[in-house]
Structure formats: structure tokens, C-alpha cells
């Protein structure tokens, strides 16, 4: 894989993913000190020449969200001042994406827009992310945004499993487009869970649209946070006669007691990617399995540098 003129740096959010990406690119990981001063302020020093290079900073803004976001901002500034030719922020998991609008004109921030502004002011010239929580966030930027998808990775794994009588389930109405695309590619039926959310991180399953009895159900979503909604959905699917229930999700946020909740749930398996490193309790959970996004990210980095099409990676 040609990677001439390309350099990859990382903060402390997901160094293992960065190491896997540069291994696929057959280049070393960029040398940088990303630490803290005694008072907790972020300290960054680029420790090699980046002049005239196309630099990618691979940094998910996952928990600790504010620390990882600030590391990214300070790294961008350090690279800009070191005369990098172009800076791409590769943010596999884009934090602060869940507040992307003002529902019913509520007095809330649009934090996704705030982060977009911060990245641009810092000096980012392109953003690369994966499975954005809301596609419209791309419009918050005045620079190019490439939102790629983990679907080829998840699809490949699903096809290897070769489940019979498969049914793709959307966890809510908002996820129907994603779930329908997966169902179409697999050539299977689609069901939808109709739910309402009275407050953040709390959802009540209302109804299931579609026949699930005797089916192997795959719940497709962009992220798992507390896992409460997912576990409740699996329980209802099993009560309606589902044979097995699997979940395929891109981002394993898995906050609070999510791993324990999944372990005790009706879910047979939860498959996630490595956009976010697994916490210790999640890594030890026998029901959670992680797939690598490194080959996809490495190929995307190369295509960006060459000026090749990225959309063709996902055309099917």
C-alpha cells in the first residue's frame, strides 16, 4: 500500500488502533510527546520533522471525552506550527455528536457544531470519521468531511457466520436507513423496534414491527452506550419467539455498567469494532467480540493522499 508523504500521529485515546493502521501502511507511527503538565494541562511536542507532509491525527474523542478532544486540538496546533503541509483529523468515534439540533427549540447547546468550529479554528483541513451518529453533522463543517462506514467489516463477519433464517432489526425508527441497507445487502427481511425515549439514556420498547418468531435477529446500530435499550430490545425479541439475538454496532461506548448488563441479558453476542478501546470489564465479557477497522482506515488514508475515490469502497 503506497503511503509516500503520509504520516500518522496519535494521542492517548486509541494508540493500539493507530499502531495497527501504520502496520497496514508499512510506516512507523509519528513520534510525539502527548502528556500532561503537573496541573493537568495537555502537553504536546512533535519529535520529528513533518514539514511538507500530509499528516493524519488518529484520535477518537471517546471517554475521557474532554481530555481526548483537547489532546486533538493541541496536536493540530503543534503540527500546524511545525509546517505540516496538510492536517487531517481522523476521528473514528466523533464525540459530542448526540446534540446535533435543538429539539422543540429547547435551550440546549448544539455541541456537535461547537466541536466542528473548534477543529476548524485549530487548523484541521479535513475530517475523517466513521458512522457519524447523525449524517447532518457533516454540514456543520466548512471543510471536507469523509464519513466512512464500518458496514463492510460487519457484513463480512455476518456472512462468515452464515446464520439461517436471518432478520435484520432496526433498534428505532431513526436507524431504519442503516438497517435497511444492511438487510438489502444480505438479502433478508427487516423488522423495526418502535420505542419512545422519555429522557436521555432511557428508552421504553413499545412495539415490534415485523415477524420475529423463529428468526435469528441481528440488531444493527451505530453505538452502544449504557446498553439498556439494546438489552431491553433483545428481551422483547426473545419474548416474541426470536431464536437468537445478536447485535452488530460500530462504536462500543459501553459506559457505566453496560458490560455487566450485556452479560446478564438475552443477547447471544455483541459484535463491535475498535473505534473505541474496550474497557477492562467489556474486554472480559464473553458475549462481546471486537473487529478491527485498521485495514479500512489504512486504505482510506491512502486514498485521501492519492486523491482516489472513497465512495467506491462502499459501493455495492
From Swiss-Prot:
Subcellular location field: Cytoplasm
Annotated catalytic residues: 195
Annotated binding of D-ribose 5-phosphate, by residue: 197, 221, 225-229
Record-listed Mg(2+) 1 binding positions: 133
GO MF term list: ATP binding; kinase activity; magnesium ion binding; ribose phosphate diphosphokinase activity
PROSITE patterns (alphabetical): PRPP_SYNTHASE (PS00114)
Cellular component aspect of the GO annotation: cytoplasm; ribose phosphate diphosphokinase complex
Pathway: Metabolic intermediate biosynthesis; 5-phospho-alpha-D-ribose 1-diphosphate biosynthesis; 5-phospho-alpha-D-ribose 1-diphosphate from D-ribose 5-phosphate (route I): step 1/1
Residues annotated for Mg(2+) 2 binding in this entry: 172
InterPro entries named in the record: PRib_PP_synth_CS, Pribosyltran_N, PRibTrfase_dom, PRTase-like, Rib-P_diPkinase, Rib-P_diPkinase_bac
Cofactor binding, per record: Binds 2 Mg(2+) ions per subunit.
Any GO BP: ribonucleoside monophosphate biosynthetic process
Superkingdom of the source species: Bacteria
Cofactor(s) needed: Mg(2+)
EC number annotated for this UniProt entry: 2.7.6.1
Role played: Involved in the biosynthesis of the central metabolite phospho-alpha-D-ribosyl-1-pyrophosphate (PRPP) via the transfer of pyrophosphoryl group from ATP to 1-hydroxyl of ribose-5-phosphate (Rib-5-P).
UniProt similarity note: Belongs to the ribose-phosphate pyrophosphokinase family. Class I subfamily.
HAMAP family reported in the protein's UniProt record: RibP_PPkinase_B
Quaternary context: Homohexamer.
Name of this chain's protein: Ribose-phosphate pyrophosphokinase
Taxonomic lineage from the root: Bacteria, Pseudomonadati, Pseudomonadota, Betaproteobacteria, Burkholderiales
Gene behind the chain: prs
Amino acid at each position: 500500500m503506497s503511503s509516500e508523504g503520509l504520516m500518522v500521529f496519535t494521542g492517548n485515546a486509541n494508540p493500539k488502533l493507530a499502531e495497527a493502521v501504520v502496520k497496514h501502511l508499512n510506516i512507523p507511527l509519528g513520534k510525539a510527546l502527548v502528556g500532561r503538565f503537573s496541573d493537568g494541562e495537555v502537553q504536546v511536542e512533535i519529535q520529528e520533522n513533518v514539514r511538507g507532509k500530509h499528516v493524519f491525527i488518529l484520535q477518537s474523542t471517546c471517554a475521557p471525552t474532554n481530555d481526548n478532544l483537547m489532546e486533538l486540538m493541541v496536536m493540530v496546533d503543534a503540527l500546524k506550527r511545525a509546517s505540516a503541509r496538510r492536517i487531517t483529523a481522523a476521528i473514528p468515534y466523533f464525540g459530542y455528536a448526540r446534540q446535533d439540533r435543538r429539539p422543540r427549540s429547547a435551550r440546549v447547546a448544539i455541541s456537535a457544531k461547537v466541536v466542528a468550529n473548534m477543529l476548524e479554528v485549530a487548523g484541521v483541513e479535513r475530517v475523517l470519521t466513521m458512522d457519524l451518529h447523525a449524517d447532518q453533522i457533516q454540514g456543520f463543517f466548512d471543510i471536507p468531511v469523509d464519513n466512512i462506514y464500518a458496514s463492510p467489516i460487519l457484513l463480512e463477519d455476518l456472512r462468515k457466520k452464515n446464520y439461517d433464517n436471518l432478520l435484520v432489526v432496526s433498534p428505532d425508527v431513526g436507524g431504519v436507513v442503516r438497517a435497511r441497507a444492511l438487510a438489502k445487502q444480505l438479502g433478508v427481511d427487516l423488522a423495526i423496534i418502535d420505542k419512545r425515549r422519555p429522557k436521555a439514556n432511557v428508552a421504553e420498547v413499545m412495539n415490534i414491527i415485523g415477524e420475529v418468531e423463529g428468526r435469528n435477529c441481528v440488531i444493527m446500530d451505530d453505538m452502544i452506550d449504557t446498553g439498556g435499550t439494546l438489552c431491553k430490545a433483545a428481551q422483547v425479541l426473545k419474548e416474541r419467539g426470536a431464536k437468537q439475538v445478536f447485535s452488530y454496532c460500530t462504536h462500543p461506548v459501553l459506559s457505566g455498567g453496560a458490560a455487566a448488563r450485556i452479560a446478564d441479558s438475552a443477547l447471544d453476542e455483541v459484535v463491535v469494532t475498535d473505534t473505541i478501546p474496550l474497557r477492562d470489564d467489556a474486554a472480559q465479557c464473553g458475549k462481546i467480540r471486537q473487529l478491527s477497522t485498521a485495514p479500512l482506515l489504512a486504505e482510506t488514508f491512502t486514498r485521501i493522499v492519492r486523491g482516489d475515490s472513497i465512495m467506491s469502497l462502499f459501493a455495492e
